[in-house]
Swiss-Prot record:
The lineage of its organism: Eukaryota, Metazoa, Ecdysozoa, Arthropoda, Crustacea. GO terms for molecular function: oxygen carrier activity. It is found in: Secreted, Extracellular space. Hemocyanins are copper-containing oxygen carriers occurring freely dissolved in the hemolymph of many mollusks and arthropods. It comes from Maja squinado. Hemolymph. The keyword Secreted applies. This is Hemocyanin subunit 3. Its main location: secreted.
Length: 25
């Protein structure tokens, strides 16, 4: 998974908080 990169900063923060392992820039 992971954010598209150009999504909302809030969305990225949520990913970092709830699923940090899936957050890969």
């Amino acid at each position: 998974g992971g954010p598209a990169g150009k999504q909302n900063a809030v969305n990225q923060l949520l990913v970092l908080i709830y699923d940090p392992k899936s957050y890969k820039d």
